[in-house]
Structure formats: C-alpha cells, structure tokens
Amino acid sequence: MAEPISLLLVDDEPGVRESVQAFLEDSGDFKVDLAANATEAWDYLQHHLPALVISDIMMPQVDGYQFLQKLREDARFQSLPVVFLTARGMTGDRIQGYQTGCDAFLSKPFDPDELEAIVRNLLARQQASSDAGSESAKLQEIYQEIRALKEQIGQPSGIHTTPSPIKLDFTPREQSVLDLVSQGLMNKEIAAQLKTSVRNVEKYVSRLFTKTGTNSRTELVRFALQHGLTE
C-alpha cells in the first residue's frame, strides 16, 4: 500500500481543523497535519515538506496572505500548492490571493467533497509537471550524449568506423527511423516527420534494438556511427 500523501492544514478554528482532517484522512490517501496559526505552520515547514498546504486567510497575528507571501519568497516553497479557505469571498480578496500566489480558493462554508477534488486536481497537476520536467531533462541528456558521440567520429582517441560484426538488413523505414534517432529526435518528432504513429515508431526502434543487440538509444546511435550505418 502506498504511503498517504502529506498535507498541512492551517486554521485557527479547532472545529474546521478537526472536521477537514477527519474527512480527508477517511479515504486513506492523505495524512493531514495541523497548525493553529501561520507561526505554527512556518515552524512545521522547517522540518517537514507536505505535498500541499490548505490555509485559512483570516488568522490572528499573521494572516493567510502574509503567510503565503513568506512561502513564495522562500525557494523551498515556491512551487508548493496552496489552497485558501476563506469567509471572504469578494473578488478583490480572490485577486489578492492569486497575485500573492495561491492556487485555489474555497469559500466557507464549503463542501468537503469539493475541497478533496481541488486537492486531488492540484496534486495531479503537480505530478504531471514534475514528470514533464524529468522527461525533458532526460531527453536533453540523450541529445547531448548523441551529439558527443558524433563529435568523436574521426577523432584520434574517439570512435572509428569499422564494418558491422553482424549482417544487418534494415528495411527502408527502419533506416529512416535510425537516421532520425541519430539526429537526436524522439519518437513523437520522428512520427511527425515520417507521418506515422508514435506506436509504429516505437516498434521500429524496438526492432533496431533487437537487430543491433543494443538496449538504449545512446547505445544504438553509438553502434550505428561506429559501423557506418548512419551519418
């Protein structure tokens, strides 16, 4: 079973804290830690990093806007999703919240199901953004590796072209895919150039791996360059 997702709820009303905590934890998907004010919340954040913060706006000493501004000024919390709970539903209040950096507003009294839906949506978006960032970094790394391999061709201490140790018989389409992979293109870009589906490109790349005895795009390009199978 997956670990519950950690959330932080900041509200000076004990009844709100207890009811929201009980509702969100009922699904088993969340663990909700509590803070009665912004100062407690800030102290908590020095030792824990929740996936999302739910905060009241009208609190004593430090209000929700000031708390959020402090979060956004700290590099550790700039991308931390924040949902505001508020009895102040005026447009100006919402604008101030969004300008300060909140991700969603929910006016009191609210339906707990709506709060849960907002929380799940924000967490899903954050995960998608994180995945996209990781994928982008991975693609950039592959591109740099391929570029470095090409620069080694012909260098005294680099890659030297030799005949392939095995007989290879690529179809015209496989050769086209190999050439484009060697340019650093990914499956979606190759599919667009060849006017085919990404699924078909995946099949061709898989066949190229099998025929060349390689297991990754970088290995495939190294093999192809080393044996003069592509430029």
UniProtKB/Swiss-Prot annotation:
<feature type="DNA-binding region" description="H-T-H motif">
    <location>
        <begin position="187"/>
        <end position="206"/>
    </location>
</feature>
<dbReference type="InterPro" id="IPR000792">
    <property type="entry name" value="Tscrpt_reg_LuxR_C"/>
</dbReference>
<dbReference type="InterPro" id="IPR011006">
    <property type="entry name" value="CheY-like_superfamily"/>
</dbReference>
<dbReference type="GO" id="GO:0000156">
    <property type="term" value="F:phosphorelay response regulator activity"/>
</dbReference>
<comment type="function">
    <text>Member of at least 2 two-component regulatory systems Hik2/Rre1 and Hik34/Rre1. Responds to hyperosmotic stress, regulates expression of at least 24 genes including dnaK2 and hspA with Hik34 and sigB (sll0306), sll0528, slr1119, slr0852 and ssr3188 with Hik2. Responds to salt stress, regulates expression of at least 24 genes including adhA, dnaK2 and hspA with Hik34. Binds the adhA promoter. Phosphorylated by Hik2 in vitro. Phosphorylated protein has 10-fold higher affinity for DNA than unphosphorylated protein.</text>
</comment>
<keyword id="KW-0804">Transcription</keyword>
<protein>
    <recommendedName>
        <fullName>Response regulator Rre1</fullName>
    </recommendedName>
</protein>
<feature type="modified residue" description="4-aspartylphosphate">
    <location>
        <position position="56"/>
    </location>
</feature>
<feature type="domain" description="Response regulatory">
    <location>
        <begin position="6"/>
        <end position="123"/>
    </location>
</feature>
<keyword id="KW-0238">DNA-binding</keyword>
<dbReference type="InterPro" id="IPR039420">
    <property type="entry name" value="WalR-like"/>
</dbReference>
<dbReference type="GO" id="GO:0032993">
    <property type="term" value="C:protein-DNA complex"/>
</dbReference>
<keyword id="KW-0902">Two-component regulatory system</keyword>
<dbReference type="GO" id="GO:0005829">
    <property type="term" value="C:cytosol"/>
</dbReference>
<dbReference type="GO" id="GO:0000976">
    <property type="term" value="F:transcription cis-regulatory region binding"/>
</dbReference>
<keyword id="KW-0597">Phosphoprotein</keyword>
<dbReference type="GO" id="GO:0006355">
    <property type="term" value="P:regulation of DNA-templated transcription"/>
</dbReference>
<dbReference type="InterPro" id="IPR001789">
    <property type="entry name" value="Sig_transdc_resp-reg_receiver"/>
</dbReference>
<dbReference type="Pfam" id="PF00072">
    <property type="entry name" value="Response_reg"/>
</dbReference>
<dbReference type="Pfam" id="PF00196">
    <property type="entry name" value="GerE"/>
</dbReference>
<feature type="domain" description="HTH luxR-type">
    <location>
        <begin position="163"/>
        <end position="228"/>
    </location>
</feature>
<comment type="subunit">
    <text>Interacts with histidine kinase Hik2; may accept phosphate from Hik2.</text>
</comment>
<dbReference type="InterPro" id="IPR036388">
    <property type="entry name" value="WH-like_DNA-bd_sf"/>
</dbReference>
<dbReference type="InterPro" id="IPR016032">
    <property type="entry name" value="Sig_transdc_resp-reg_C-effctor"/>
</dbReference>
<keyword id="KW-0805">Transcription regulation</keyword>
